[in-house]
Amino acid sequence: MVLGKPQTDPTLEWFLSHCHIHKYPSKSTLIHQGEKAETLYYIVKGSVAVLIKDEEGKEMILSYLNQGDFIGELGLFEEGQERSAWVRAKTACEVAEISYKKFRQLIQVNPDILMRLSAQMARRLQVTSEKVGNLAFLDVTGRIAQTLLNLAKQPDAMTHPDGMQIKITRQEIGQIVGCSRETVGRILKMLEDQNLISAHGKTIVVYGTR
C-alpha cells in the first residue's frame, strides 16, 4: 500500500460509472416538489438542502445532505410517485444521476448498493424521529441549540480554537426550527451572553464542540 494514496471504493466507482454526472451551482434547484419521480441522485461533491414550501411560499428546511448521500430514493419503491420536497444546492455540487429502472438492474448485479441506500434511509428515519421529538418536547431555545450542535457535526463545519465554526443565516435557522428570524436573533444573543456561542453575521462558533 502506498502511503498517502487515498483508498478507492470499487463498488462506488462501479456504481458511478453507470451514472450521468452533473454539476450544479450554489442555490440552484435540483428537484422540484410535485414533479414526477424517475431518477435517483447521489452527491459526489458538495451539499444540498431539502425543504418544503407552504401555499404562501414560506420555506422550511427538513435536512441537509452531503457528499456520499443519496437523494430522491422514495420514488424507487413505488411507481408514479411525485417529489415530496424541493432540493436546492447549498454549495456548488457534483451529482450523479441514474434512472430508477437502471438502478434496479444494477442491484441485481451488486446488492451492496441497495444495502448502502437502505442503511442511509434507516439513519434518516432515526434523525427524523429525533427531530419530531425535539419539536414536541423542546422549546424554541432548545431546538435552536440542538440545531447548532447538529450543524457543528456537518462535513462543512470548520475547526476553530474554541469549538466548531459554521456558516448559516438567521433566516435558515428559523426555517429549520420553525420560528421567525427575529426570534433566532434574540436566542443567539442569549446563547452568546451565556458564553455558549459567538455569532457574527453568518458565522457562528459553537463552543466546546471539537
UniProtKB/Swiss-Prot annotation:
Changing G163 to A/C/D/R/S/V: Decreased transcription activation (2-62%) at class I and II promoters, binds DNA. GO terms for cellular component: cytosol; protein-DNA complex. Gene3D superfamilies: Jelly Rolls, Winged helix-like DNA-binding domain superfamily/Winged helix DNA-binding domain. It holds the Pfam family HTH_Crp_2. Residues 180-186 bind DNA. GO terms for molecular function: cAMP binding; DNA binding, bending; DNA-binding transcription factor activity; identical protein binding; minor groove of adenine-thymine-rich DNA binding; sequence-specific DNA binding. Changing T128A: No modification of cAMP-binding. Keywords: Acetylation, Activator, cAMP, cAMP-binding, DNA-binding, Nucleotide-binding, Repressor, Transcription, Transcription regulation. It comes from the Bacteria. The modification N6-acetyllysine is found at K101. The record marks E97, K102 as: Activating region 2 (AR2). 3',5'-cyclic AMP 1 binds at G57, K58, E59, M60, I61, L62, S63, G72, E73, L74, R83, S84, T128, S129. In the apo-form the DNA-binding helices form a rigid body in which their DNA recognitions helices are buried. cAMP binding causes a coil-to-helix transition, stabilizing the active DNA binding conformation by reorienting and elongating these helices, which precludes a return to the inactive state. Interaction with SpfP blocks activation of some, but not all, CRP-dependent genes. The N-terminal domain binds cAMP and is responsible for homodimerization, while the C-terminal domain binds DNA when cAMP is bound. A global transcription regulator, which plays a major role in carbon catabolite repression (CCR) as well as other processes. Binds cyclic AMP (cAMP) which allosterically activates DNA binding (to consensus sequence 5'-AAATGTGATCTAGATCACATTT-3') to directly regulate the transcription of about 300 genes in about 200 operons and indirectly regulate the expression of about half the genome. Among the targets of CRP is the spf gene which encodes the dual-function sRNA Spot 42; spf expression is repressed by CRP. Spot 42 base pairs with and represses expression from a number of mRNAs encoding proteins involved in the uptake and catabolism of nonpreferred carbon sources. CRP and Spot 42 coregulate at least 14 operons involved in cellular metabolism, forming a coherent feedforward loop. Interaction with SpfP, encoded within the Spot 42 RNA, reinforces this feedforward loop. This is DNA-binding transcriptional dual regulator CRP. The gene is crp.
